[in-house]
Amino acid sequence: LATIIYQNQIFDKKQIQALNLNTIEDIYLRDSLLFCQKWLQGCEIVEVKTSGSTGTPKVIFPTRHALQASVAMSQKFFAWQGGEKALVCLHTQYIAGKMMLLRGLELGWTMYLQTPNNNPLATFEQNLDFAAFVPLQMQNILENTPQKLMLFSQNANIIIGGASVSHHLETMIASVGNPKIFQTYGMTETLSHVAIRRLNGSSQKNFFPLEQVQIRLNEQNCLCISSPTTLFQEIVTNDIAEIYEDGSFRILGRADNIINSGGVKIQLEQVEQEIEKIFEQIGLQRRFYCIGTPDNYWGEMLTLCIEGEKLPENTEDKLQKSFQGLSNKHFIPKKITYQTHFTETETGKVKRQALL
């Protein structure tokens, strides 16, 4: 039977249904239990917010049937038998957190609910079969408490989603023996993941769609998805992709992250992937993003925006020299700017528009 454990409180299905939620002061617990209560009462439509990292947050209203299809797709892929122990440490007003709760309710899991924080395993001591993390959480676990991965059972799985996985994090994950760790691809509109790639063990370069998920590219090379979670209605994403003969695909970047600099189209994510390796080589541990800033000569000038204080002059010189090794001369930033703190959404995604 599905159970939610939060700090020292235990709630089973019957208790959740009977709860007077006005008596619960903890906002995260109350919101999570309210969602569970509505689901257990048989609601046919669920309200879900998008994170707003790529624009104004919006609300969608998926059906119960579509949400159950998402649970079934994941259950088939991960071969869940029911009764698993899972850690729920994501914001439950967004789709990733809601889907964790729904999998638990539908499959009779024991769910350890935890207010989202940077290292969910820091003080955690229970055995686990499944967890979903954002990349920042996974990185903190591996850097600060790698021994906590021993809490995961032999057949356990971890999924990572919500933001891109850096080259540095991917390298760390590749050396983890157990549990199996996957990166997911999906969005609010597809009711969490519709494709998956393995990051350790027999790792994969590309995402593989889950069963019954159909993909194609439109004329702009944007990925179009049809799946049980969309009730087989096609969703046109903003993600520029490549699809391969084996049915797998790779995301190159977002259509709205292409700039036109002096007549040359540049996909910002491709530049960032190369610059990230340069940061690693010179031992620079800072967050950064590439943006196109308006310019009379270039139209949009490729600009590297680094989080934090201005770098010492010798470090910035070293960085500029390293740029000469980039695979494409158009990938060399024309300008470096600094921002004390990047603006983030509630789910920890950086708002690129705020960098301009």
Predicted regions and their residues:
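Conserved ATP-dependent adenylate/AMP-binding module captured primarily in the ANL superfamily
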Residues: 1-26, 68-87, 117-129
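Conserved pre-ATP/AMP-binding loop-to-beta segment of ANL
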Residues: 31-49, 83
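Conserved AMP-binding A3 loop
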Residues: 45-72, 79
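AMP-binding/adenylate-forming
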Residues: 62-69, 85-140
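Gly/Ser/Thr-rich phosphate-binding loop
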Residues: 145-201
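AMP-binding/adenylate-forming core of the ANL superfamily
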Residues: 214-236, 240-242, 248
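AMP-binding/adenylate-forming catalytic core of the ANL superfamily
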Residues: 238-331
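AMP-binding/adenylate-forming catalytic domain of the ANL superfamily
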Residues: 326-349
